[in-house]
Amino acid sequence: MNFLYSTVNTLRDRYTPVSHKSTFRQTGQITPEEFVAAGDYLVYKFPTWSWGDADSPERRVSHLPPGKQFLVTRNVPCHRRLNDDFAGDAGHEEALVNDGDDFKGNAGDDEDGWLRTGGLASSQPLKVKEVRTVDDSGNVGDREVVEDDEIPDMEDEDDDEAIIRDSGADSKNSAHRTYTLYIMYSPYYRTPRLYLSGYLANGQPLPPTDMTEDIVGDYKDKTVTLEDFPFFANNIKMASVHPCKHASVMKTLLDRADAALRLRREKLRAGNASSSQAPSGMEGLVDEIGKLDVKGAQEAADKDEWEEVQEAEIDDQEVAIRVDQYLVVFLKFMASVTPGIEHDFTMGV
């Protein structure tokens, strides 16, 4: 069934007439030319990304130039699985982020928000643990509380010869993985499409079915398929996030970013904020993307709802996110699908 599904998707993209009419603001879809512009922007701003070419001229698509058939980034770290351990950790490290929060401790005006899980370890108080000691005869002592000051610093110990290392077992059982991420253009859906190829800690290819351990359950069960990457001559199975909802989610994210920008500018005009508080350039883009409610946008797309935003006319100078910045927002969306994969690693400025 998966093979048939993959074949149908490939044929759709191969034979669908390509549209060159821009409907970026209206639909969240982009043209091949806009995909190239967004790819050039991504590669320029984030050099861990690069353009790739098909293995042979026969595998190239005519609507994209040679050498710019897809985007790729390699060695993206992934340190933990999306299993019960991941969920439990997230449950202990969650916070409500209000719309308008600046992520520096200042709350926004909106009471609604989205739940941010994980990544808050530094904000949690350290808990004192009870430990037991064992003497030279093997007798177990009573429980006692150990304070931080009493814990020896391993850096102060020089007894390296006493450490038993098993590098083979470590690499086999390690939770650490790396991923190569590919972004191609889908003419049928007129959106980017993400492919993932994983590797174990020892460098061995990750079995395709194991890649689903790093994908959020809702997507893993519904919209993720294992398919061959169409630009490679050898059949290499990868996990791919199906783009059927990409356009509607992206449209909602773009609309919300524009609405937030308009609100900020209205406050500036009203004198409620100084011009120095309005970030610009790459800093401003990262700030806008960091506040996007991906979860809410996904829910709206699942219900086939279009975000209702004020119908004010907006020119290119007033939009929060330009079309050439499309892939930066797209990767924010994909990071919510694969939260264990450190997408931020690929986007260091």
Swiss-Prot record:
> What's the domain of life for this entry?
Eukaryota
Is Cytoplasm included in the keywords of this UniProt record?
yes
One Pfam family in the UniProt entry: Autophagy_act_C
Name where it mostly resides: cytoplasm
Keywords tagged on the record: Autophagy, Cytoplasm, Protein transport, Transport, Ubl conjugation pathway
**GO terms of biological process kind:** autophagosome assembly; autophagy of mitochondrion; glycophagy; nucleophagy; protein transport
**Chain spans, region Handle region:** 248-325
Similarity section: Belongs to the ATG3 family.
Indicate the quaternary assembly.
Answer: Monomer. Interacts with ATG8 through an intermediate thioester bond between Cys-244 and the C-terminal Gly of ATG8. Interacts with the C-terminal region of the E1-like ATG7 enzyme. Also interacts with the ATG12-ATG5 conjugate.
State the protein's purpose: E2 conjugating enzyme required for the cytoplasm to vacuole transport (Cvt) and autophagy. Required for selective autophagic degradation of the nucleus (nucleophagy) as well as for mitophagy which contributes to regulate mitochondrial quantity and quality by eliminating the mitochondria to a basal level to fulfill cellular energy requirements and preventing excess ROS production. Responsible for the E2-like covalent binding of phosphatidylethanolamine to the C-terminal Gly of ATG8.
Query: What's the protein called, per UniProt?
Result: Autophagy-related protein 3
* Species for this entry: Gibberella zeae (strain ATCC MYA-4620 / CBS 123657 / FGSC 9075 / NRRL 31084 / PH-1)
Q: What is the lineage of its organism?
A: Eukaryota, Fungi, Dikarya, Ascomycota, Pezizomycotina
